[in-house]
From Swiss-Prot:
Keywords: Acetylation, Cell membrane, Coiled coil, GTPase activation, Membrane, Phosphoprotein. The gene is Sipa1l3. This is Signal-induced proliferation-associated 1-like protein 3. Residues 1239-1255, 1344-1357, 1503-1512, 1620-1630 have a biased composition (Basic and acidic residues). One of its GO terms (cellular component) is tricellular tight junction. The keyword Nucleus does not apply. It holds the Pfam family SPAR_C. Residues 1715-1769 form a coiled coil. Residues 131-140 have a biased composition (Basic residues).
Length: 1776
């Protein structure tokens, strides 16, 4: 750029004042100088002495403006002819003026010198007031370039060619500026003028010549008290308000401050009215006013954009109401974009006078130089001077003047970047401003930014700064397919409104000059909309209203919403005048004239609207070597080093400039005068040309390297590339008015494979923050990710810089000239008359009163309807005035003071709201919210906002509930990790209160759920005396309300996981997104979990979320079938009773039905791919911690013997059915961790009878503990009520514990997780595959599936998980047959859409599966367990606990002795509970009366004995009972993990016997499937110990081996979980043995004995009846282990069949007979297994006895030896 240097005599005074400091006093321009002579002293060189003759300057070029190329913004400014012409008239100096200017120059120089090193007091007092004016004006271009100023274009200065071209443009603009009036007005003072471009590096910027107090002194003449400390303090106090509220900062106040005063003085008479109105505002009134305005100007360094009112608060307070009162647009007007919502007509009118005064104020690197002499420039100037102390430079003035309270920078530094005044640094961890609740809960803006920024913009969420257009066409709304890229921010995309909706279409343009607003332009268009069913044809008017302000009113208004005397909906339409008068009543309609219909008008309007849009950017790159930091050093690096070359190669392509046809950024593409090559690239349709310092021409004899600086110094954004060892960068070292943003990139390990880069950013303080945010403490590897990140940062940086004062002012002036040109030269004489061509009609219409607009018509507008509200800013703990906008796509909040978006979310993300009389809380996403208060006197706005939300979102009004606990302290529902209700206990207190499956908890006891982890959620529900919750009801189908981005993100991540984790057999690994696949009414519950892909912190939640997807996966089922045997057995019983019930359980009921089922249902669905589940957890990574804990806890329970599960879990990949296994694996792997939460699951299982504690660990476990039964107490109560009877029993209990884990609200992920943990802890897990099979079925089943190593086992396991999942998902009215469960899993996953919820549980336990289970004799116990599971659902916790105990005993313990009478149907929950009470926990934990303690449920009067008999006897009964239980008892009976958990909780890992492990699961399983119980009946307990369990084992044999597989089979689903526990050596309890409750159980011994007998006699029948659904013809005789496996496999293959079986539990006579035969065979096998187990146990007992005897002998021997030693020592002592 070219700089104007004063004539020789201009700097005379400077010599005297600055001579001491000057180092370069050459008469001619110094080779390295590009600044005016007058400023050499400041820049480090000295001006020529006073005595220097004019001859010295004769060699300089003439004062004419040099013809230098215009670049960048300056180039655009130069192209603004209208403004230039107007300004030129005023700026042409006269000779006399020149003379005055010379004199003035001397004074100015001296003043500068004073600023730079002399005391301010030395400044002449006469120049005080003028200096003050200059001060304020320095913020404006006009002031800075006054004629009196040495460098003023109007002065007789010789142009310096050394300046960058950037100044030329600015100089030209300045020349055009009205400098005369200022110069003339203040002839005695040097007129202020500012420099642009690299020249700005000079510290001498306009006013900076004086210190702040100097100015005050000078101003004393006008206001003696201006300098008073009190006044100053007051002014300062006001200023802050003005800064923060009045205007963005520098922009509004400075521009409107002092400059206004001067400008007002120079205003023409035409402006007297405006002047008088704003005198007080401008400080023209009293001296005080002047002071305030001055201070405002001085301190206001913020951009106008920050403040809605450029005048500033101070001015506003004194200004007329119209200036201070914000303009409110009609509510029926739908805004097209964000900036339209900020349109303020009063502000536009108030700023009319100041527009001309708001000259190009400096910002960015030059911000220090102009308005507040940025420290950056000051420091750089001082640096160049060397002798000057930066403290005495204009920087000091800036600090004092601009912000009396600031500006020292932000004290934010690191090894890349130092803090700098007037600059703001971003070194990592910063986040954009957001007023939502979660942002405050997360911590400081920098907190948790890393996670937030890991992929800053690579998500469906939009950053606040990227929100522009609010009215989005349907085809573009929430486009899931759109690529995820970093958001481009700070772009006014709404500027294309005219291009997209008006150009080429019929519309009308009107121009005119309003007396208040000045030139205005209106575009209006009428368009047809879809007809309304009730209101007929619909039309809307699209309107664009432009004023000189950059903010434009764009939007539309429905014809029906417009008051008019004309009929709506006609082809003719309304008079345009009516629409405009309604929308903009303040506009003088009569001044408008129709625009000429010429291409020029359209072209001009497009330029006017889109002047801020640019897709071409030029960016500078400076190379900083080790030990360097200064601008000069960087510019003088002649060649690029290898590290720099490597960086350039990554950043873009090196192109040859000669002949280059794309964007060249002012580089010479013809003669190579600017270098031969440059760096060019593109990103998201943006072209970027880099000005690389080493590629630009190098001048050896010019240290300033002007040929390089002329380009880089004029770039708004500059990248500083630092080699290792470079000194930290500071903008103080850069001298440029245009460089506003510096992006520092430092390379680490350059030119190696480990090369990486770290970043930091510093921006001018009046430039808003921009993204993508830099992760805290993160380095970027050399990759396209880093390249994209950096390019997005560069583009956003330039966009943000354009909002700074300088560019804002330039754009405003340009816009004003465009409008003026249109209003004067492009209009016709046709007015916009309401009558128009219908004069007669209009005359008559005038007499008519305008009809009111149709109420609520605007509610259906696509644009954003806006309301003024007060929003709670949780991050800052304050309330801010905002505009709420709700369009068809977004809900946004705009801060009126800063004029920025402070919140946005998709309408599809809104899930609910809580309205009050004058406030409203809007919930979105996972329960986060914003809190709004209606403006005073606008209470009706809340009603309108609610109505708008109903129209545009899928949310619903929240419901407050106070939940009661039952006798066991249970709440009666399960909660998933994301706060959605997995299941609700039928007829429980929660159910009675209106809680339904799919409901979403957003607040618990006044605590926002979004801030709670799953564990915390459960603990809060467990421990709160009074549980008050705020819930958002689900959709009609029971699906939870979820945010669209959440759903999309989860879906996207889940599929990824699935594909990534796909395991052999076509099943995705646990990570796989199986849950996504599942889709069905029932699965809706799980689906949400799936959506969330929450790591299922509560294993329960995870499985739910993933189960859905898994459910569809058939391969998982297939793998499950083997495991299905046991799982089938375990779920068979429950499902037999609950198949129909489960199916028919509505989505809402499903939750209740599946207290445990939700988890299991999910699991059932998800079980198809336990591995998927594991994979899913990855998508849910954010929740993994919880997932780990809860999952582990539930995993423990569910993986009950998951110690082996770990290994098995790996197997589970083949048998992905076990979602739990993923967690189970975790628990197994972590062991202690799993055990930690298992207790939780136990509680959970207890909580919800329906919860399949093991089968559905995810939901039941945590959920149960949390809500279902307040499982915390439940699980604890389980422990309390039931004490492990035997080690084996405790082992079973551990599985139950897994179910107990259920106590965690949704920890139920792994019902058997606790047991799994115990198992994991126990060495027995050695045979994980066996235990997994068993465990898997019963809630451990999932885990089992996850952990079973053998495919068969996996299949078994997966079925078990299915059972759990099904139970969980569908009120585990699991089919009685355990085999059904595994197939159900498989089937569930296929059928899942519906089954996932209720069928899920059922599907989880398909008839086939159950048959298989029953086929496996060992499963009977599991079936009984399943039966208990059902029981637990319908029965109180106590029942479940008892049942689980019973089942466990039956399965693992007493099974061997006698098949426990199948409580499978458990029609009478009480009976079942009683029977199981002791069995489950080995203690009379649950009493028949305990059921009463449970939440209210349908009561079944049958006694336990009757129930057992029914279960045993009924072929039909199994199914019937399933129905009964399914309706309520079954569901209630269906135990979630909570029941199982209870059992497991009691049992210890040491009880790892398959039976005991099984029992825990079986207890759950009992509720889920009867068949499982028969399997369980077999001594599955220590299968792991002995590799060959009874018949059950054979079926598992494929996976484990005959002995072990059989045991596994025998173990059944619950056994699977137990088996995992057993994976350590576990013993199978004789399924024939029925666990007996303790006397304290409250059971009648006679009833128990009868039940036991019935169980023994009818065990086969029970199994069959329970298995009926599962054993349906699809399941071939499951009697043989292999058959069981096969049937299980079939189950998975025919998921629906499985569910159908469970549904069809009642078979025809032939089918029943067949089932009975199969069951008999299975029973026979079970008996054989039991016998084998007995033999094994006997041998073990013998071995233990031998060991005991040996140990005793050794102990005695040791004692004897010790005695002898003692005697020996005593003797020696005596002798001594």
């Amino acid at each position: 750029m070219t700089t104007y240097r004063p004539l020789p005599n201009d700097g005379v005074d400077l010599a005297a004042s600055c001579g001491a400091r000057s180092t370069d006093i050459l008469p001619g321009p110094h080779p390295g100088d590009y600044t005016p002579m007058g400023f050499w002293a400041q820049n480090g060189s000295m001006p020529q002495p006073l005595g220097e003759s004019p001859a010295a300057t004769t060699t300089r070029p003439s004062p004419t403006t040099p013809a230098m190329p215009k670049m960048g913004v300056r180039a655009r400014v130069a192209d603004w002819p209208p403004k230039r012409d107007a300004l030129r008239e005023q700026s042409n100096p006269s000779p006399s003026q020149d003379t005055d200017g010379v004199k003035t120059t001397k004074v100015a120089h001296s003043m500068r010198n004073l600023q730079n090193g002399q005391l301010p007091s030395s400044t002449p007092a006469s120049s005080g007031s003028r200096a003050f004016h200059r001060l304020s004006r320095r913020r404006s271009k006009d002031v800075e370039f006054q004629d009196g100023w040495p460098r003023s274009p109007g002065r007789a200065f010789l142009p310096l060619r050394h300046r960058s071209s950037s100044e030329i443009t600015l100089s030209e603009c300045d020349v055009e500026e009205p400098g005369d009036p200022r110069g003339t007005r203040h002839p005695g003072v040097l007129p202020l003028f500012r420099e642009y471009g690299s020249t700005s590096s000079i510290d001498v910027q306009g006013v900076p010549e004086q210190s702040f107090f100097d100015i005050l002194n000078e101003f004393r003449s006008e206001q003696p008290e201006a300098r008073g400390s009190q006044n100053l303090r007051e002014l300062l106090q006001v200023d802050p308000g003005a800064l923060s509220g009045g205007s963005c900062g520098t922009k509004g106040d400075p521009r409107n401050g002092q400059p206004t005063k001067d400008s007002l003085q120079s205003l023409q008479p035409l402006k007297e009215k405006e002047k008088s109105r704003k005198k007080p505002v401008r400080g023209l009134g009293s001296g005080d006013t002047v002071d305030s305005s001055i201070f405002r100007k001085l301190r206001s360094s913020k951009p106008e954009g920050e403040v809605g009112r450029p005048l500033g608060e101070t001015e506003e307070s004194r200004s007329p109401p119209e200036a201070s009162r914000p303009w409110v647009c009609q509510k029926s007007f739908a805004h097209f974009d964000v900036q339209s919502m900020l349109f303020d007509l009063n502000e536009a009118a108030a700023n009319r006078v100041s527009v001309a005064q708001r000259r190009n104020t400096t910002t960015g690197a030059s911000a220090a130089s102009a308005a507040s002499a940025m420290v950056t420039l000051t420091a750089s100037r001082a640096h160049s001077l060397g002798t000057l102390d930066p403290a005495f430079t204009s920087t000091e003035d800036l600090n004092c003047k601009e912000n009396l309270e600031q500006d020292l920078g932000d004290d934010n530094s690191n090894d890349l970047l130092l803090s700098c005044p007037h600059f703001r640094n971003e070194i990592g961890g910063e986040r954009e401003r957001n007023v939502s609740f979660s942002r405050a809960s997360v911590g400081s803006p920098g907190g948790s930014s890393e996670a937030h920024m890991a992929e800053p913009t690579l998500s469906t969420h939009r950053t606040n700064a990227s929100i522009s257009v609010l009215e989005v066409p349907k085809e573009q709304q929430r486009t899931q397919s759109r690529p995820r890229q970093y958001s481009i921010e700070h772009v006014d995309l709404g500027a294309r409104y005219y291009q997209d909706y008006f150009v080429g279409k019929e519309h009308a343009n009107y121009f005119g000059v309003d007396e208040k607003l000045g030139p205005v332009a209106v575009s209006i268009k009428r368009e047809k909309l879809e007809d309304h069913k009730d209101h007929g044809p619909q039309y809307q008017y699209r309107i664009i209203f432009r004023t000189r302000e950059l903010i434009t009113l764009r939007g539309s208004i429905l014809e029906d919403a417009t008051p008019t005397a004309t009929k709506h909906g006609t082809g003719r339409g309304l008079p345009l005048k009516d629409a405009l008068e309604y929308v903009i009543p303040e506009l003088n309609i009569h001044c408008l004239r129709l625009a000429l219909n010429t291409p020029k008008v359209t072209e001009q309007l497009l330029k006017l609207d889109e002047q801020g849009l640019c897709r071409k950017h030029k960016v500078g790159i400076l190379y900083c070597k080790a030990g360097q930091s200064s601008e000069e050093e960087m510019y003088n690096n002649e060649e690029a080093g290898p590290a720099f070359e490597e960086f350039l190669d990554l950043l873009g392509d090196k192109v040859c400039l000669k002949g280059f046809t794309k964007y060249a950024a002012q580089l010479d593409v013809k003669t190579d005068s600017t270098g031969t090559h440059s760096l060019y690239t593109t990103y998201q349709d943006y072209e970027i040309m880099f000005h690389v310092s080493t590629l630009l021409p190098y001048t050896p004899n010019n240290r300033q390297q002007l040929l390089r600086k002329r380009h880089i110094g004029n770039d708004i954004v500059t990248i500083i590339f630092q080699e290792p060892g470079a000194l930290p960068f500071t903008p103080k070292n850069i001298r440029s008015h245009f460089q506003h943003v510096f992006i520092i990139v430092r390379v680490h390990n350059p030119c190696t494979e480990n090369v990486c880069y770290s970043m930091a950013v510093t921006r001018s303080k009046d430039a808003p923050p921009f993204g993508p945010p830099i992760p805290n403490g993160t380095t970027f590897r050399k990759s396209d990710v880093f390249r994209d990140f950096l390019l997005a940062k560069v583009i956003n940086a330039e966009n943000a810089a354009h909002k700074s004062d300088k560019f804002h002012t330039m754009a405003t002036r340009t816009r004003q000239e465009y409008l003026k040109d249109l209003a004067e030269n492009c209009v016709s004489n046709t007015p916009i008359d309401s009558s128009g061509k219908f004069n007669l009609i209009s005359l008559t219409s005038k007499k008519k009163e305008k009809t009111k607009a149709r109420a609520g018509a605007e509610q259906h507008s696509a644009g954003a309807i806006a309301w003024r509200v007060a929003a709670q800013d949780y991050a800052q703990g304050s309330e801010i005035d905002c505009i709420l906008g709700i369009s068809n796509e977004f809900v946004v909040l705009l801060d009126l003071r800063t004029k920025e978006v402070v919140f946005n979310c998709y309408c599809g993300d809104v899930i609910g709201w809580t309205p009050d009389s004058s406030t409203i809380k809007i919930f979105y996403g996972r329960g986060d919210h914003i809190f709004l208060q209606a403006a005073e006197g606008s209470v009706e706005d809340i009603r309108d906002i609610v109505q708008r939300l109903k129209v545009m979102t899928n949310g619903w009004e929240t419901v407050d509930m106070t939940l009661r606990r039952n006798g066991l302290g249970q709440l009666g529902f399960h909660v998933k990790y994301d706060g959605t209700v997995a299941e609700v206990e039928d007829y429980g207190f929660a159910w009675q209160a209106g809680l339904r499956q799919g409901s979403r908890l957003v607040e618990i006891c006044k605590v926002a759920v979004v801030t709670l982890s799953h564990d915390q959620m459960i603990d809060l529900l467990r421990t709160s005396v009074t549980v008050k919750v705020v819930i958002i009801p689900p959709f009609e189908d029971g699906t939870p309300r979820r945010g669209w981005p959440e759903t999309y993100d989860m879906n996207a991540s889940e599929p990824k996981t699935e594909s990534e984790t796909t395991t052999p057999g076509g099943r995705p690994p646990y990570r796989s997104n199986a849950p996504w696949q599942w889709s069905g009414p029932a699965s809706h519950n799980s689906l949400p979990a799936t959506k969330w892909t929450t790591p299922a912190t509560p294993g329960h939640a995870q499985s739910l979320s993933r189960l859905p997807k898994q459910t569809p996966v058939v391969p998982f089922r297939e793998s499950q079938p083997l495991h299905s045997k046991r799982p089938v057995s375990f779920p068979e019983t429950p499902f037999a009773a609950s198949p129909a019930g489960a199916d028919r359980v509505p989505p809402y009921r499903q939750p209740s039905g599946s207290f445990s089922t939700p988890g299991s249902a999910t699991y059932a669905r998800y079980k198809p791919s336990p591995e998927r589940y594991a994979a899913a957890p990855h998508p849910l990574l954010s929740f993994d911690p919880h997932f780990m804990h809860d999952g582990m806890s539930s995993g423990d329970s569910s993986s009950g013997g998951l110690t082996s599960q770990e290994s098995t879990m790996e197997r589970p990949k083949p048998e992905p059915l076990w979602h739990v296994p993923a967690q189970a694996r975790l628990s197994a792997m972590t062991g202690s961790i799993g055990s930690k939460h298992p207790s939780r699951q136990d509680a959970a299982g207890k909580d919800s009878p329906n919860r399949h504690s093991k089968g559905e660990p995810q939901y039941s476990s945590h959920s149960s503990s949390n809500t279902l039964s307040s499982n915390a107490s439940s699980s604890h109560s389980d422990d309390r009520w039931f004490d492990p009877l035997d080690p084996l029993e405790p082992e079973q209990d551990p599985f139950s514990k897994g179910g107990s884990s259920d106590s965690g609200i949704d920890t139920t992920l792994y019902t058997s997780s606790p047991s799994c943990m115990s198992l994991a802890k126990a060495p027995r897990p050695t045979k994980p595959h066996k235990p997994p099979g068993n465990i898997g079925l019963c809630g451990g089943g999932r885990e089992s599936a996850g952990r079973p190593h053998p495919v068969d086992r996996r299949r078994e396991v997966s079925p078990a998980p299915v059972v759990a999942g099904q139970n969980k998902g569908y009120r585990p009215k699991l089919y009685s047959s355990g085999s059904c469960t595994p197939p159900g899993l498989v089937g569930g996953s296929r059928d899942p859409p519906r089954q996932p919820s209720d069928m899920g549980s059922r599907a989880g336990y398909p008839t086939q599966v159950y048959k298989t289970a029953s086929a496996e004799t060992p499963r009977p116990s599991q079936l009984s367990q399943c039966s208990p599971f059902q029981l637990s659902t319908s029965v109180p916790k106590s029942f479940f606990s008892k049942q689980p105990a019973h089942n466990k005993h039956s399965t693992g313990w007493k099974r061997t002795d006698e098949p426990p009478p199948r409580p499978l149907p458990f029609t009478d929950s009480k009976k079942q509970v009683d029977t199981n009470a002791k069995n489950v926990f080995g203690q009379p934990r649950l009493r028949a009366s305990l059921r009463d303690l449970r939440s209210p449920r349908k009561n079944y009067k049958s006694t336990i004995e009757d129930d057992l008999k029914k279960l045993i006897v009924m072929d039909n009964l199994g199914p019937e009972q399933e129905r009964d239980t399914g309706q309520s008892p079954q569901k209630s009976l269906q135990r979630t993990l909570s029941d199982e958990s209870l059992c497991s909780g009691r049992r210890e890992p040491s009880f790892a016997s398959p039976a005991s492990l099984e029992p825990g699961l079986p207890s759950d399983v009992l509720f889920t499937s009867t068949c499982t119980f028969p399997s369980s009946t077999l001594p599955a307990r220590r299968q792991h110990q002995h590799a060959h369990p009874p018949s059950g084992a054979p079926s598992t044999t494929p996976a484990t081996g005959n002995g072990f597989p059989e045991k596994k089979s025998a173990i059944s689903a619950s056994e699977l979980s137990l088996a995992d526990g057993r994976d350590r050596p576990l013993r199978r309890l004789d399924p024939g043995m029925m666990p007996l409750p303790d006397t304290a159980a409250g059971l009648e011994w006679s009833s128990l004995v009868n039940a036991a007998k019935a169980y023994e006699v009818q065990r086969a029948v029970s199994l069959f009846s329970l298995n009926d659904p599962a054993l349906s013809p699809e399941i071939p005789p499951a009697h043989s282990p292999v058959h069981s496996h096969l049937s299980l496999e079939r189950g998975p293959q025919t998921p629906r069949a499985t569910p159908t079986m469970s549904e069809e539990s009642p078979l025809d006579l032939t089918g029943k007979v067949y089932q009975l035969e199969v069951m008999l065979k299975q029973l026979h096998t079970d008996l054989q297994k039991e016998k084998q187990d007995k033999v094994v146990l006997q041998s073990e007992v013998a071995s233990l006895r031998q060991n005991n005897q040996r140990l005793q002998e050794e102990s005695q021997a040791a004692s004897e030896q010790l005695r002898k030693f003692a005697e020996l020592f005593s003797r020696e002592k005596k002798e001594l």
